[in-house]
């Protein structure tokens, strides 16, 4: 663990440009990384918060083929969407680059050449899967088959998304090409491999011995499992037509493997930022007094904790990550998030449909963050978090303080009189919160830290509820001056402590309190007010108060200062807004079922005479009742136009008797009678299933009379 670092390099996993950003990405990576970076800046730390678009690899080529465009058009489209979404959502990157940039191609090529020239790669001719019909090798997601570890029949050539195992394409059982559907053959090809087995002792000492107590159990456990299972050489090149050329002779038609190329994107993005800011990039990656932290999802643990560190170690001049606080997965309404199935809450759509509610989503995702286990996002929980917590606790406290200050003192903060024991206890408790929240943030427990932030608002609400200044004002207005002064100190503290978690709210609260007018007052406070930080998204962080000022000063907002009028920080979200989102997901679910529903194979051929033997009539259900002691059966009286007959039908789990009386149906009238539970059934009701797999009646769309035949 890096002690007292001079600077921080914070990386967030490069989002893949084959689709927009969804809430799973935010909860797993970008919101916690942003909280951490903003927190460090509030302490005046030197922070480089780095990210960029991951634009190479098989998934990009597949997306381009599917959309009938070039890979460049695909990455340009999604890089634009992703970049704008992050900016609008307030993710405060110092630099957001892209791996298609020249600086990245140069950096990745140079990194490869360094290891190549040092003899760190194994050059080997191996047999790889090849699609003879498409005339190309099948890397990664160009092939699908059964996972050898969990029997998932839809595992990819690089990873099984069901069990999380990292695979080679040749590991798959019964592989199929995703290009043509053909069974691939094995064909020889030359590639370069990073011999991970050579780094097993280094990784064991560095991680298993050195980070046993400070890395998250889910990360440590997965890494230990990999190391204990025995590390093997890992390919760093691929037979592809999209990506970074392998920069050595004899490598024509080969590209750098995306998981060799992508993490180097952190370095090239840092170079890009440093060049723009007139800084030296190397200390952020090569100085032992720099703390390097990778924020990722659990599916990237092996790459950031084993492969990339082995690459850095092999190169020889880079520092290693101090921590990799990977999160588990976020599910949506009980189901796994899926870009391909459109089962997601897309960030760009959320920002359009919930304008000015960036912080509500940040709050909901952090409150329910999958820090140690998979968690579930539901729209009802999102609504409850907003209405019952942000509105009722945080917003309610601030609104009461500002309204009362304007009502009693025309917005001018009163001079306090003598503090009571309750006042002093409340202010002392307030001063303790920065350290409490810091402890959680610095251990990457952001959900816990957010809970402590809300406890600050609860402290304010409790103080007002116990002191009741609106009642005291009648008999002791001098006492109310002190009460309001104390409450305003809590509000001022919230404007700082909320900034990492709820940056838009913090900025709005700072504006309401007119903290920008207090620079002279804060001259004796932290040096941070003299610094102005501007990130790549043009989000200005211009705080007049630093994090530690709350613990060190009692007059965060002084007597005589005039605040602004009250504005609602949060608005209640109505049921109709939430139902609209739930309906949207239900429509997606129905569409997915319809798309994935495969028709049953055609039955053996019959002669026309065989069909002509069936007497199918239109009828109407006159009566319906449940069959005693039979959960699946209904006893129906049906007018077939020929007669009224009894038919026993196995539809009780799909329909109640009441809802089908009067229903028009198709009846196989000349089916031989059959006794079911002692009741003779004289025919069969024809049914099918809809896109959701539910039983539905086969009935005429025109007004055919009972007894009409189906020919």
UniProtKB/Swiss-Prot annotation:
Xref: SUPFAM superfamilies: Anticodon-binding domain of a subclass of class I aminoacyl-tRNA synthetases (SSF47323), Methionyl-tRNA synthetase (MetRS), Zn-domain (SSF57770), Nucleic acid-binding proteins (SSF50249), Nucleotidylyl transferase (SSF52374)
Lineage of the species this protein comes from: Bacteria, Pseudomonadati, Bacteroidota, Flavobacteriia, Flavobacteriales
Family to which the UniProt record says this protein belongs: Belongs to the class-I aminoacyl-tRNA synthetase family. MetG type 1 subfamily.
General function of this protein: Is required not only for elongation of protein synthesis but also for the initiation of all mRNA translation through initiator tRNA(fMet) aminoacylation.
Main location: cytoplasm
UniProt organism field: Flavobacterium johnsoniae (strain ATCC 17061 / DSM 2064 / JCM 8514 / BCRC 14874 / CCUG 350202 / NBRC 14942 / NCIMB 11054 / UW101) (Cytophaga johnsonae)
Keywords carried by this UniProt record: Aminoacyl-tRNA synthetase, ATP-binding, Cytoplasm, Ligase, Metal-binding, Nucleotide-binding, Protein biosynthesis, RNA-binding, tRNA-binding, Zinc
PANTHER family in the cross-refs: METHIONINE--TRNA LIGASE (PTHR45765), METHIONINE--TRNA LIGASE, CYTOPLASMIC (PTHR45765:SF1)
Chain residues that bind ATP: 339
Gene name as annotated: metG
CDD domains (alphabetical): Anticodon_Ia_Met, MetRS_core, tRNA_bind_EcMetRS_like
Top-level taxon: Bacteria
Top EC class for this record: ligase
Annotated catalysed reactions: tRNA(Met) + L-methionine + ATP = L-methionyl-tRNA(Met) + AMP + diphosphate
One GO process term, biological-process aspect: methionyl-tRNA aminoacylation
UniProt protein name: Methionine--tRNA ligase
């Amino acid at each position: 663990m890096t002690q007292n670092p001079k600077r921080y390099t914070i990386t967030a996993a490069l989002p893949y440009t084959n689709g927009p950003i969804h809430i799973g990405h935010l909860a797993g990576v970008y919101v916690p990384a942003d909280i951490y970076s903003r927190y460090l800046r509030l302490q005046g730390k030197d922070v480089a918060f780095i990210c960029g678009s991951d634009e190479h690899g098989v998934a990009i080529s597949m997306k381009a083929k599917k959309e009938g465009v070039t890979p460049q058009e695909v990455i340009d489209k999604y890089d634009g969407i992703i970049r704008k979404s992050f900016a609008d959502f307030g993710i405060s990157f110092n630099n957001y680059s892209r791996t298609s940039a020249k600086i990245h191609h140069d950096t990745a090529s140079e990194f490869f050449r360094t290891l190549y020239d040092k003899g760190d790669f194994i050059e080997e001719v191996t047999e790889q899967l090849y699609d003879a019909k498409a005339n190309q090798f099948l890397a990664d997601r160009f092939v699908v088959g059964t996972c050898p570890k969990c029997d998932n029949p839809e595992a990819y050539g690089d990873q099984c998304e069901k069990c999380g195992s990292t695979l080679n394409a040749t590991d798959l059982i019964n592989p199929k090409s995703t290009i043509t559907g053909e069974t691939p053959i094995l064909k020889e090809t030359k590639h370069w491999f990073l011999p991970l087995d050579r780094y097993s002792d280094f990784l064991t000492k560095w991680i298993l011995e050195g980070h046993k107590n400070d890395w998250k159990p889910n990360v440590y456990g997965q890494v230990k499992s990999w190391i204990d299972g025995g590390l093997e050489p890992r390919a760093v090149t691929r037979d592809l037509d999209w990506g970074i050329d392998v920069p050595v002779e004899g490598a024509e038609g080969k590209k750098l493997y995306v998981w060799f190329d992508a993490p180097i994107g952190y370095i090239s993005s840092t170079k890009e930022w440093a060049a723009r800011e007139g800084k030296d990039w190397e200390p952020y990656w090569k100085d032992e007094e720099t703390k390097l932290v990778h924020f990722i999802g659990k599916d990237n643990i092996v790459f950031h904790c084993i492969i990339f560190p082995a690459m850095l170690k092999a190169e020889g001049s880079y520092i290693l990550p101090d921590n990799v606080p990977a999160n588990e997965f976020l599910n949506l309404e009980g189901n796994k998030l899926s870009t391909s199935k459109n089962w997601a809450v897309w960030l760009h759509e959320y920002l359009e449909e919930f304008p000015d509610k960036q912080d509500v989503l940040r709050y909901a995702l952090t409150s329910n963050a999958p820090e140690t286990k998979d968690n579930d996002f539901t729209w009802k929980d999102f609504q409850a978090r907003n209405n019952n917590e942000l509105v009722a606790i945080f917003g309610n406290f601030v609104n009461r303080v500002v309204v009362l200050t304007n009502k009693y003192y025309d917005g001018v903060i009163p001079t306090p009189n003598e503090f009571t024991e309750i006042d002093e206890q409340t202010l002392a408790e307030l001063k303790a919160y920065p350290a409490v929240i810091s402890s959680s943030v610095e251990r990457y427990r952001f959900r816990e830290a957010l809970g402590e932030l809300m406890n600050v608002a609860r402290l304010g609400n409790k103080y007002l509820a116990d002191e009741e200044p609106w009642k005291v004002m009648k008999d002791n207005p001098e006492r109310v001056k002190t009460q309001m002064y104390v409450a305003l100190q809590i509000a001022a503290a919230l404007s700082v402590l909320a900034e990492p978690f709820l940056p838009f709210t913090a900025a709005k609260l700072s504006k309401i309190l007119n903290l920008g007018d207090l620079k002279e007052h804060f001259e004796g406070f932290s040096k941070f007010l003299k610094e102005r930080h501007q990130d790549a998204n043009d989000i200005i962080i211009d705080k007049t108060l630093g994090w530690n000022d709350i613990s060190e000063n009692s007059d965060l907002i002084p007597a005589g200062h005039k605040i602004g009028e009250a504005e609602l920080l949060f608005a209640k979200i109505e049921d109709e807004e939430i139902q609209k989102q739930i309906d949207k997901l239900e429509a997606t679910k129905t569409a997915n079922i319809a798309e994935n529903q495969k028709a049953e194979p055609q039955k053996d051929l019959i002669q026309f005479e065989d069909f002509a033997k069936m007497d199918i009539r239109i009828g109407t259900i006159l009566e319906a009742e449940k069959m005693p002691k039979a959960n699946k059966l209904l006893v129906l009286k049906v007018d077939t136009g020929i007669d009224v007959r009894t038919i026993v039908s196995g539809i009780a789990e799909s329909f109640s008797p009441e809802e089908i009386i009067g229903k028009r149906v198709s009846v196989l009238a000349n089916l031989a009678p059959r006794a079911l539970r002692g009741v003779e059934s004289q025919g069969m009701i024809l049914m099918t299933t809809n896109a959701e797999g539910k039983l539905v009646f086969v009935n005429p769309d025109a007004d055919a009379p009972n007894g009409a035949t189906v020919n």
